[in-house]
Amino acid sequence: MPKPTKGPRLGGSSSHQKAILANLATSLFEHGRITTTEPKARALRPYAEKLITHAKKGALHNRREVLKKLRDKDVVHTLFAEIGPFFADRDGGYTRIIKIEARKGDNAPMAVIELVREKTVTSEANRARRVAAAQAKAKKAAAMPTEESEAKPAEEGDVVGASEPDAKAPEEPPTEAPEN
């Protein structure tokens, strides 16, 4: 059963808070980042992340659940067509809050909330690890044929004893250079 928000609400009544969060989420999905007060950004973060999780699933039921909260169909289409698939391989943490300097007029603490647009650090690290492993494997494969040719046993057509270190080649008499 839904419980009302305890403590102070943004804008006074619960209906006004729902409207504020819906409008902030619409602006966030439309522009990618917004500047707002820090309490509004903190309240918006779980609200927006739940909507993105619905968009990742992509079913008609999820679209209708999001349409109950966001009234702009263009933003909902963007959410389901672009934002949801972008975060398909990410489990949460779709938004980032960055504190900025206080607002000049009333000294309210301000923050920027934005969608995280770069891939995760771990996926970048995994990609770098795979590339390094592939390069090491290629280097090892390139080194293997030279080792095989050095350690190759003598075949039937080879001269026996020519590769032995004790075998001496027949000595030829030294030839003297013609004098001019």
Swiss-Prot record:
Gene Ontology cellular-component annotations: cytosolic large ribosomal subunit
Keyword Ribonucleoprotein: yes
Region of interest: Disordered: 134-180
Record's keyword terms, sorted: Ribonucleoprotein, Ribosomal protein
GO terms for biological process, alphabetical: translation
NCBIfam families for this protein: L17
Known partners and oligomeric status: Part of the 50S ribosomal subunit. Contacts protein L32.
UniProt name for this protein: Large ribosomal subunit protein bL17
Species annotation: Mycobacterium tuberculosis (strain CDC 1551 / Oshkosh)
